[in-house]
Amino acid sequence: MVSYVNALLYGVGGIVVAGMALLVAFQDRLVYVPVLPGLTKSYPINPARLRLIYEDVWLRSSDGVKLHAWFIKLLPDCRGPTIMFFQENAGNIAHRLEMVRIMLQKLQCNVFMLSYRGYGASDGYPSQHGITMDAQAALDHLMQRTDIDTSQIIVFGRSLGGAVGAALTKNNPEKISALILENTFTSILDMAGVLLPFLKWVIGGSTAKGLKIMNFLVRSPWSTIDIIGQIKQPILFISGLQDEMVPPIHMKMLYAKAAAHNKQCYFVEFPSGMHMDTWLTGGDRYWRTIQHFMEQHVSGRKHDGSNSRSSDSQSS
């Protein structure tokens, strides 16, 4: 009996040690994927290929890292809303250009696309602290421009970009008009158990029931669930119910946490939407949803109408 217990303890200990080793060695490769398999770090195309009006922007983050971005304009003199688009964790901003091309047309806006450090033409290596500084540098750049209306800046983040955008929005309540989150996770701590199921017993976010004894090993927790309730600006939550990477329940949890503190929250589901293609499968309804949200809450586009925190208001 004693030998059986010892063997069990050794087995559990071995699993914990193996999990710790995997987490330390590979976590950054799971969270940040600047180069897709079979491709290079460089941009396969630029906005000119799609006949878009754009500017190469070079920035310095507060720690001196050189960053690259594209500022894409609807028209040379367009002073309408500017959307700061923060991408997912894999690939680079060039892989989002087709979606952005349609975004410009449907929403009649400008789009600022930042390459996180370590992505695309930006220097450095990605980390939560570093990317948070990168996003702030991008916003500071926009606020200094004289060719846009700085009262109409909207943050749009998908997946990892949602975590980046939520942090930026919370930290800049007077500069950002609204936030749009699409298929975003509650935290990397919660996603650890999704990617590696055995980790859910030892790693988890603030709402998890596990022991959380290995949370200290996670270098980029991106705990959006812990800050979403502090955001005062209007928030639109877009959830693809066929998301194969981030369980849709994460978006519902984020909405519930935000709506408990913010009456200007909206939750919209797209039954056919997967992690990366909700904008495509959602069709015209997807773009109408965002357009309506912007008309309600972005300076210069506001229409008369009552605000609502109910998911039913836009989820028809």
Over which residues does each language-model region extend?
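Primarily recognizes the serine-hydrolase "nucleophile elbow" in alpha/beta-hydrolase
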Residues: H141-D147, S151-L195
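Short beta-strand/loop motif that positions the catalytic acidic residue
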Residues: Q230-K232, F237-S239, D243
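Membrane-embedded segments
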Residues: R60-H141, A163
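C-terminal catalytic histidine-bearing segment of alpha/beta-hydrolase fold enzymes
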Residues: K252-A256, A260-S316
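An N-terminal hydrophobic leader/cap segment in hydrolases
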Residues: Y10-W58
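Acidic catalytic loop of the alpha/beta-hydrolase fold
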Residues: Q242-V246, M276-D277
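Mobile cap/lid helix-loop segments that gate and shape the active-site cleft of serine hydrolases
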Residues: L189-Q233, H292
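Alpha/beta-hydrolase-fold catalytic nucleophile elbow
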Residues: S115, E182-N183, F270
